């Protein structure tokens, strides 16, 4: 069984965020960190080299594979800010339709910048995801 590369580390979240070159992305990431911290009641931790995660949960797959993973998290990437959210069975299409400019993938929400989305709707998506992860 392959070892999961992305694990919680002791690296400094603040140092990582200070290293985000684009000032507006850095500010957005700090705000997203606050939103996620509020939703999970957890302090941010680095997962691997580039993901800021909140909380921890144990996942078991039908294949028998088990791993520890963050409840929710985010990562500033070259093209966008990736939010790692727990979506349960599916995305909440009603909330997503009110969010603004975004894309979705498997458990990921991609936004360019916070100014492209409705922050209140994003907070609801984050809170819903945190609650979903809590129950898994």
Where are these regions (language model features)?
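Charge-dense, helix-prone N-terminal extensions
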Residues: 1-136
